[in-house]
A protein has these predicted regions:
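Residue at a conserved register position within TPR or TPR-like alpha-solenoid repeats
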Residues: 26, 33, 67, 101-102, ...
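TPR/Sel1-like alpha-solenoid repeat signature
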Residues: 26-33, 45, 60-67, 79
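Structural register within alpha-helical repeat arrays
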Residues: 22, 28-29, 63, 97-98, ...
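Cys/His-clustered metal-coordination modules, chiefly Zn-binding fingers
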Residues: 153-231
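Start-of-helix register in tetratricopeptide repeats
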Residues: 17-24, 41, 58, 92-93, ...
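Alpha-helical repeat scaffolds
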Residues: 2-10, 39-48, 73-84, 107-121, ...
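Short coil turns that delineate tetratricopeptide repeat
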Residues: 15, 54, 88-89, 122-123, ...
Length: 231
């Protein structure tokens, strides 16, 4: 109750930076209710968070996860697409849940079409390979190997190359021992790379913190997949 009172007081301050902080407070309150299985109040405070900050990725992600857990897959897909629209850097954060929701909705082609549209502005190799692998599994319109090779050469990266070698090995087109050695080396390099970085103070690591533990800023920690994609 005290947390809600503080958030409501701060919400009255007409300042965008403050509204962003209030949105995070509402997300914290929503998480508390979610832990106590009070889904109605959890949903209420997520909507309040978005009302405070329409660009709040955290609230939209939580909303998608809540919808998915309740079996409202189409609503979850809608929220996940909003995450990408608000901040394309979070694309890889939503792909697993998005795949699940599309599959549960019986719309396997829908995911392929969405990823294809994302590739226009984000031509990362690992995203392209995700699409290739997904199409192989689902039997959707498949990408030719020639087109795949051309993309890997055009957009070289450590992460993309690692995924590409895995696919080639799985298809039996590469001697096992050679592929294993290359994969082992690539994965050691990738494991040393940070997954997230605070834009405010530069703190980098493997965990996504909505409030940076070093500088205490809210919402400044972002995925660095794009950075790792540059090779």
């Amino acid at each position: 109750d005290k947390a809600i009172e503080i958030a409501e007081t701060l919400a009255k301050i007409k300042n965008q930076a403050m509204h962003e902080i209030v949105a995070h407070y509402y997300c914290e309150i929503s998480h508390f209710y979610l832990d106590n299985k009070d889904y109605e109040r959890s949903l209420l405070f997520l909507k309040r968070a978005i009302a405070q900050d329409k660009q709040c990725v955290r609230a939209e992600l939580a909303l998608a996860n809540l919808y998915s857990a309740q079996g409202s897959y189409k609503l979850a897909i809608k929220s996940l697409k909003k995450v990408y629209a608000k901040n394309p850097e979070f694309l890889y954060e939503i792909l697993t849940t998005l795949s699940f929701c599309y599959e549960q909705s019986g719309d396997e082609k829908g995911l392929a079409e969405f990823v294809e549209s994302c590739l226009v502005d984000n031509p990362q190799t690992s995203l392209y390979l995700f699409l290739y692998d997904y199409m192989q599994k689902t039997g959707a319109n498949k990408i030719s190997k020639q087109r795949l090779h051309e993309h890997v050469l055009k957009y070289p990266s450590i992460v993309g190359l690692n995924t590409f070698v895995k696919l080639v090995e799985k298809e039996g087109a590469w001697p096992g021992d050679d592929a294993t050695t290359i994969l082992s080396s690539l994965e050691k390099i990738i494991s040393s790379l940070p997954r997230y970085k605070c834009n405010e103070c530069g703190l980098a690591g493997k965990m996504l913190y909505w409030q940076c533990p070093r500088c205490k800023s809210w919402g400044e920690t972002k995925p660095v997949y794009a950075l790792n994609e540059r090779g």
